[in-house]
């Protein structure tokens, strides 16, 4: 509707994207009848049907259970590979950021600012490998611990400065 396309073409694109996100046959199901993971996939398909150059995902997987989250992470990587779209993912999950990002930016709090940037190989590895294996990769574990320690130390510094006020 937004682009005033032919309704038949639009319906075909809807079916294609629902199939890609694993929801073939759910096109006429009301959203409220879908599980949380299915609703997230509908939201992703709804975004992608408009063929944006950039996809902004703000905490898209935070409310999902562990299994559904892992499936959605694989789906995001698959869509990234197949479409070549730029995806900006905002998340509080260090592990998720490491798995899905080519670049990771750690923000420092109060005031919010860029603290450190990382270039990562794990998303590319995830295109061909098992995400669970990547999570156990020694480089992945090391990077996760480095970032978590950095964040922990920043939080401690803030708490100490608040105590001394």
Region locations from a protein language model:
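Helical segment within the ABC ATPase nucleotide-binding domain
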Residues: 69-83
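Conserved signature/switch motifs of ABC ATPase nucleotide-binding domains
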Residues: 29-32, 50
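Conserved ABC ATPase "signature" region
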Residues: 7-26, 78
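Conserved small/polar residues in nucleotide/adenosyl-binding loops
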Residues: 163-165
């Amino acid at each position: 509707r937004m682009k005033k396309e032919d309704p038949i073409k639009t319906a075909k694109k809807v079916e294609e994207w629902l199939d890609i996100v694993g929801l073939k046959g759910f096109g006429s199901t009301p959203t409220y009848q879908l599980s949380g993971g299915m609703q997230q996939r509908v939201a992703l398909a709804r975004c992608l049907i408009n063929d944006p150059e950039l996809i902004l995902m703000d905490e898209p997987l935070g409310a999902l259970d562990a299994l559904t989250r892992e499936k959605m992470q694989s789906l995001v990587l698959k869509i990234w590979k197949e479409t070549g779209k730029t995806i900006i993912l905002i998340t509080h999950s260090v592990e998720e950021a490491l798995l899905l990002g080519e670049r990771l930016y750690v923000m420092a709090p109060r005031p919010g600012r860029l603290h450190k940037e990382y270039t990562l190989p794990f998303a590319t590895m995830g295109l061909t490998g098992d995400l669970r294996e990547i999570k156990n990769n020694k480089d992945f574990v090391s990077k996760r611990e480095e970032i978590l320690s950095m964040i922990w130390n920043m939080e401690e510094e803030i708490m100490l400065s608040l105590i001394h006020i």
